[in-house]
């Protein structure tokens, strides 16, 4: 389980990866185009609320009863994620994201970094 889909859901629409690990780059190339509409909606919700796209993604997880535990690379990401606890999505926002997720052309692998 990856609440931010390995960071995909925190990436702004139109974002392209820099050089990264071969596995992560491969995943990004596969997942980014198919998640564009969903990420556009998350960016729009974030802009309307004055919050980040990461906060929208984490709130979307929380709206389904999950307690997301994202991984962080930088301290600023911890602060950003903690701000997601200060608000919740409306039913309309959640419904929009749910529908776009169903319509998405790609699915996140179960756990691409899990060892056997």
What are these regions (language model features)?
Residues 1, 68-70:
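Hydrophobic faces of well-ordered beta-strands that scaffold small-molecule active sites
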Residues 1-18, 52:
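Aromatic-lined glycan-binding groove of carbohydrate-active enzymes
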Residues 5-6, 63, 74-75:
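Short, solvent-exposed loop/turn segments at secondary-structure junctions
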Residues 8, 77-80:
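Phosphate- and divalent-cation-binding pockets in alpha/beta enzyme and binding domains
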Residues 17-48, 63-66, 79-116:
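Terminal-tail/helix-coil boundary detector
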Residues 51-52, 74, 90-91:
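Helix N-cap / loop-to-helix initiation motif
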Residues 56:
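Glycine/threonine-rich phosphate-binding loop and adjacent beta-strand/alpha-helix elements that clamp
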Residues 59-60:
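Hydrophobic, secondary-structure "cap" segments at the distal end of domains
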